[in-house]
């Protein structure tokens, strides 16, 4: 090597080592996450954005459903009470309820103290007149003989107008759990139930894990003989999913590394060459993680799991180089021959991965950036570093023994052209008959939660009566008071819809926390003490109630007339306060993306069209309320982003086509490269559909990657040298690179995380077909 060459080699090594050091420095300061909301769209419509926020941080996302089973009902009830007592004193939980009265005391005291500001009855006509009071007393007399008579007898002297009962009726509507020994039980009586809500958001997995650990500790301290605890909820699923992602990333990467290493040893029979083969992979992975961390502020665990794919594709470059070094040649001369094709293959792969880079899903955008940076760095290390480190005189001599047999088999692939045409045409005809690929945009199909866990969650929800919202009204406003007033405007039309049978009921933050304007109106409607006393005296005539029995009532109304108005800050820590926090949301950002929203979950919706019509008539044009059908809107959201991904995929394919035309300047040669890729995508789609897989946006991403990785095979087949030795080594290198690719992506397909499994399985099948079809269609 001449001095100039040695200087360039040393410079390449220095730049490489400094780059690795910089990457390690950045990675050491980069946070890692497993928040699956990264695989929700980043910029949907305003209504869909609210849906995404609720999936991440809504009140339901903070809910933990707990069951204690095993043993007698008495023992289970005792454990439930001990657990609830311990958790109510835990700062990590905003509310804990197991059906005991103790858990409802703060809410009951709040409703009683502020009943005249909370009850809509305060502003009804004649409510505090002699006529209205007489009607209320007559109703009280009838209620005293009902099953609720004991409660009425206790509160009657202070609440003859029935404000507390009115509010309780207002909150009724959801299903209630069974009760035994004063605590909640499942329908079959075999499981005591608790409902805990964490202060931490559902997406804060670290905090969710700590809260769940505290819950386990409370059970351990309270449990009786033979008892066990089961737990479910979004926070539980998030924690288990993160553990699954972390486990898959390490497990799959380790297995892929071992299998590819065995393949390298079989082919090169040199531990040193084995180490060198993994340098492009390791360098690309470190660079990809560092750049993603700098660009996104954090690296998702799924991005690390996806790093296993670089073991397949990144090691391809080393295989192409090492395998094609013939005896008597060297790495530099071989690279001069390979580099134009290898460089074009890298560029086509980058075009394919760009479909991920511009995705509206932050998680997919991370995968795209990681892959593009990783492949470019892996190719650069192969080009500039490996020739310096590779021993002079190296040649993969085992290729000489393997190549003749492999070449004979490959040359016979041309006999498969007719079956190839039949299969491809049949696949195309089938897809045309179906009207296109059978895409599924069902959000539930992407859930990483195992079926048994989903079934347990469903059982606990049914037994405990936990909310499982399907329809939700979103009422936006510039500020919190505006949102409460918007919710109040919807009360009358929703009540009429309930009476018409369009829905069974609804919840509203204004039921718990009326707007300040409404509170002022109710306070102004309360009569002065002397006027109320005179009206009560007339209304009480002819009733069995003695004089002076309602003095507490007169006192409480007078106190309410001058009492401070209720704000969220003055509400005590309770389930009602948590309900307000879950239904009155301050949104981040400014303009249309900021402000506040009131959420009104609906129950038993029968006529969505009637509800939408009522909303249009009851809300102002500037900030109209919207009805969200959670499942429908979630599926529509994924459908719209799948269509966006389709356009990005087509853009990537067009970019590859333009790149090939600019490089080859021959329509025939471009066709020779693209034909096997198009056929591989077509047949892979059909095989996935016939296997019963639900094709999602992530399968579409996988198909775009089939083009990205398969283009290397078709390019090398199209440009293979006419010299027999070079052709043999080219085909052997393609075969072993494809095996490495199939190992990496095939293992990814076994992941329990739908994002990884969908992409891995699609690319594994498509990559193998790309090589097979390239061999079948190659010109001789």
Residue ranges and their predicted role:
Residues 24-26, 38, 81-192, 207, ...:
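Alpha-helical transmembrane helix bundles of large polytopic membrane transport and channel proteins
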Residues 278, 329-359, 722-751:
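Pore- and gate-forming transmembrane helices of large, multi-pass membrane proteins
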Residues 417-540:
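Juxtamembrane segments of multi-pass membrane proteins
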